[in-house]
């Protein structure tokens, strides 16, 4: 088994808001994603949502206030909490979610997540 170089994986694609699976463990997917602009308001009824900023800055809008994340910072959105990620400039983010979790809360989007 070899290590995973996240910067190398991130260099393989340029699209935004399309998570790519880089590893899996205990029924969870470890993903990297490039983000820029505003995503959509959504929630996950059955799971928390883990965000860790690898590069840049990310704001996670919540209905009761915003969470601002810088490089090296993380935040977990509790299950059922509506949120909307925003990045003014391109940011690189690490996500960890149960395998097959839709990135918008809509089951159709789970099928669009690919592995690198």
What is the predicted role of each segment?
Residues 2-10, 23, 88-116:
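Double-stranded beta-helix
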Residues 6-41, 47, 105:
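A short glycine-rich, His/Asp/Glu-containing loop-to-beta-strand
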Residues 26, 54-55, 70-71, 89:
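A cytosolic small-molecule/anion-sensing beta-strand core signal
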Residues 27-29, 36-38, 55-59, 66, ...:
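Short, charged/polar surface micro-motifs in flexible loops or helix N-caps
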Residues 34-35, 44-61, 96:
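Short, conserved beta-strand element in jelly-roll/cupin
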Residues 62-63, 71, 87, 105:
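Short glycine-/acidic-enriched loop or helix-start segments at secondary-structure transitions
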Residues 63-80:
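Short acidic-glycine-tyrosine-enriched beta hairpin
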